[in-house]
Amino acid sequence: MIKKLITSVLFLSTATLCFADTNILKVYTYDSFISDWGPGPTIEKKFEETCKCDLQFIGVGDGAALLARVQLEGKQTEADVILGLDTNLIERAKETGLFAKHNKTLDLNLPITWNDDTFIPFDWGYFSFVYNSEKITTAPKSFIELAERSDLKIIIQDPRSSTPGLGLLLWVKAVYGDDAGKIWEGLAPNILTVTKGWSEAYGLFLDGEADLVLSYTTSPAYHIIAENDFSIKAAIFDEGHYMQIEVAGKVLGSDQSDLADEFLEFMISERFQSIIPTTNWMYPVINLKSNLDKAFLSPISKNKSLIFDPKTAQEIRGPALNEWLEILSK
């Protein structure tokens, strides 16, 4: 009996020591990334196969909520890496002084040249309003047409908490400039609800609560590939579509700095990037060895691709948000 007890104690002690020796990398990201159907579970498994570590993804609402969380926690944050900001937020993120430079030479395949020294892209896509073609036979081809269609109800996301919501704000601004307010005045009666994040908005759309939802031109690819459903389509606007490039960055002063660097290197490898298209339903940032499914063929030509540089996005964000809040509160 005593021998069994000693053996048990030794086993538990050894297990505890092994656990204590395992490096833990904490990555803050948005909720849909770590959902059962998102890329998180597969990425966690693949990274842990080689890192000899415990990769822990921590869901923090939607993309814009990530930055708010890190700002709130400041230097006391437990995060080693933040994954899920985008180009519209990285200037604000840099101003916090909480992120380290990556010091990497990047070989990326993006529609634009990437030269940021702090954040590294992991996927990209175009915002679009998604609809069910079995219910809507003629989709709007512009924001003006959408605003004039009183028969259509739309769901959008809050630009204060959601990167798609902020992307929509800047999309309207990129197309209409000083006349953006008039577009929002026209759209306001059509807005069924404003959700905190993308997942909630898309779920309501799939439940039939609205005619269109703010999402991505690649969203139909999910329904085609995973469900063999060709009815969900992206409305293509003649005036162009705003691009989203999602990024990750290392937290300055992380206790796992080397491991964080290893993860960021892994993030732009074939092993990570090959997971993105059919789990996050976005485009990879490198040339993959195998071709993407034809469902991912982009309907957006280069001259219809819209994006503000990070500094301009930061300058526009505040006034555009105030304008949006004022109009939608009427």
Locations of the language-model features?
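Extracellular/periplasmic bilobal clamshell ligand-binding domains
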Residues: D293-K330
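Mature extracytoplasmic/periplasmic domains
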Residues: V251-F308
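Short beta-strand->loop
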Residues: F99-L106, D117-P121, I144, I224-Y242, ...
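Extracytoplasmic ligand-binding site segments that recognize negatively charged/polar headgroups
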Residues: I24, Y28-G40, G61-A65, T77-A210
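A ligand-binding cleft/hinge motif common to bilobed small-molecule-binding domains
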Residues: N88-R92, L206, A210-S231, N280
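Periplasmic-binding protein-like
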Residues: I112, G125, W184-A188, V194-T195, ...
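A bilobed periplasmic-binding-protein/Venus flytrap-type ligand-binding module shared by bacterial periplasmic
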Residues: S128-K135, K173, Q244-S257, I275-T278
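Short alpha-helix C-terminal cap/hinge motif
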Residues: P41-F57
